[in-house]
């Protein structure tokens, strides 16, 4: 059993034209795997502020949080994350995403093709359970 203290993190589910915004993680946990943009909530920061900041840092895109989608808990090794995922919309519809911070790569992947890429553990099921993948 891990003795790691739970850390609060956020994720941003951003869909445009039936494509999901995903980043390839540059660092662990999940290095090399695709995930939605997100990360740890910093002290003094609201959940919505954390979503906006993480998307900006990892993709260069500006978003507005639309609604809470759901939460997951990820335990492994030295990590224990409680991740709260939010649907977010782009402030500028035609903005171009550019990988930054700990994102090695950024892409818009058609929702129906998500099963063909290496997603972080549990993400495909989460997106299916919450109606993003149908």
Question: What are the residue ranges of the model-derived segments?
Answer:
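Conserved N-terminal beta-strand and adjoining loop/helix that marks the start
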Residues: 1-20, 40, 71
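Conserved beta-strand segments that form the floor/walls of ligand-binding pockets within enzyme
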Residues: 9, 35, 85, 107
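A structural signal for short, well-ordered beta-strand segments
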Residues: 12, 68, 86-88
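Conserved hydrophobic "DFG−1" position in protein kinase catalytic cores
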Residues: 14, 22, 88-90, 108
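Conserved Nudix-box catalytic region and its N-terminal flanking loop in Nudix hydrolases
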Residues: 19-57
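A short coil-to-beta-strand element that immediately follows conserved catalytic motifs
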Residues: 62-70
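Active-site-adjacent beta-strand/loop module that shapes the phosphate/pyrophosphate-binding cleft
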Residues: 72-95, 130
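NUDIX/MutT-family hydrolases
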Residues: 97-129
């Amino acid at each position: 059993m891990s003795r790691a203290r739970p850390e609060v993190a956020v994720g941003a589910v951003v869909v445009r034209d039936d494509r999901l915004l995903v980043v390839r993680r540059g660092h662990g946990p999940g290095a090399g795997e695709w995930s939605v943009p997100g990360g740890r909530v910093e002290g003094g920061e609201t959940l919505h502020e954390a979503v906006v900041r993480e998307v900006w840092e990892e993709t260069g895109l500006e978003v507005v949080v639309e609604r809470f989608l759901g939460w997951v808990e990820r335990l492994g090794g030295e990590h224990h994350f409680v991740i709260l995922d939010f649907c977010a919309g782009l402030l500028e519809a035609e903005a171009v995403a550019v990988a930054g911070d700990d994102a090695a790569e950024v892409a818009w992947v058609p929702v129906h093709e998500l099963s063909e890429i290496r997603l972080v553990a549990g993400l495909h099921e989460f997106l299916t359970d919450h109606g993003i993948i149908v």
